[in-house]
């Protein structure tokens, strides 16, 4: 398929050109880019509509000045999801072009959502010229310090993932899990529990926690993990592929916080 595509499009004016796509985050001047696509994960940014500037810059090989000068692509823009808003058309030349997209994350339910903005050549049967990946991780915002993970049915190899906002000021969480309705009575179940936060300037091993748990039916088990308040916590439960018997899983996450307050005291001496 790849070879057939290359042969069919070898005469396209942008054949072998590198379409460099960059995204300017909101609040930063044009030209200050730090991302290839759009990724929203925090509570504040996933509960509003956010605007981004997308720059598409064609890059040709050395010595292809004439091809670069003659480039004139009349592209149509479309989003794969209705919560992403883009212009209808884009005129793309060798100098590149910038356009705006709006991501209405506030209209989405909690969970993981993905979309793409696709630019197609209107003069060549809709050939894809570039695309912009968009990912929104919208957390559940608990009304108090306890979050109750929805009861789920886990079968062999199944993965269930939830995202929850950690209340500001929380420094640790107690996670209590309980299994019930075992498909194979009087047996224990074995599954993987993984928890993760993305914290700036922290390596992954410092912000992720994972456990392999073996539970008897209706027997609770608790784990305590450090958390960072005001950030999204990912909770993932997965049953091992080698375990054939399914079960129901319940999980409660209770957040706690304890911060030290620096104080200065003075003493007189003789």
Please report, for each region that a protein language model flagged, where it lies by residue.
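Extracellular and analogous surface-interaction loops
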Residues: 44, 161-171, 223-229
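Acidic, Ser/Thr/Pro-rich low-complexity intrinsically disordered segments
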Residues: 153-160, 164-206
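C-terminal edge strands of extracellular/lumenal beta-sandwich accessory domains
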Residues: 69-71, 107-108, 118-146, 182-187, ...
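Short proline/glycine- and polar residue-rich coil/turn motifs
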Residues: 88-96, 124, 212-217, 227
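Short, solvent-exposed loop/turn segments enriched in Ser/Thr/Gly
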Residues: 46-54, 95-97, 106-118, 158-160
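Surface-exposed binding patches on compact interaction domains or structured appendages
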Residues: 16-39, 47-49, 53, 57-102, ...
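Non-catalytic extracellular/lumenal accessory regions of secreted precursors
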Residues: 9-45, 56-66, 119-122, 127-163, ...
């Amino acid at each position: 398929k790849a070879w057939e595509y290359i042969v069919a499009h070898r005469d396209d004016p942008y054949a072998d050109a590198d379409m460099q796509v960059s995204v300017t985050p909101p609040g930063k001047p044009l030209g200050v880019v730090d991302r290839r696509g759009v990724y929203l994960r925090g509570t504040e940014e996933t509960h509003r509509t956010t605007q981004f500037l997308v720059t598409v810059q064609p890059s040709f090989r050395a010595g292809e000045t004439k091809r670069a000068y003659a480039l004139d692509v009349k592209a149509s823009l479309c989003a794969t999801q209705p919560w992403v808003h883009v212009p209808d058309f884009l005129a793309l030349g060798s100098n590149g072009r910038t356009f705006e997209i709006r991501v209405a994350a506030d209209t989405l339910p909690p969970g993981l959502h993905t979309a793409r903005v696709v630019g197609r050549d209107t003069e060549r049967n809709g050939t894809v010229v570039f695309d912009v990946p968009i990912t929104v991780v919208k957390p559940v915002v608990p009304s108090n310090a306890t979050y109750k993970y929805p009861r789920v049915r886990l079968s062999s190899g199944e993965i269930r993932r939830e995202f929850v906002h950690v209340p500001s000021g929380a420094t640790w969480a107690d996670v209590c899990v309980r299994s019930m309705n075992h498909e194979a009575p009087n047996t224990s179940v074995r599954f993987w529990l993984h928890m993760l936060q993305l914290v700036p300037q922290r390596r992954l091993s410092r912000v992720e926690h994972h456990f392999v748990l073996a539970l008897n039916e209706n027997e609770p088990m608790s784990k305590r993990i450090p958390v960072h308040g005001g950030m999204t916590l990912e909770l993932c439960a997965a049953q091992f592929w080698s375990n054939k018997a399914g079960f129901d899983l319940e999980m409660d996450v209770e957040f706690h916080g304890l911060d030290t307050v620096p104080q200065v005291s003075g003493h007189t001496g003789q």
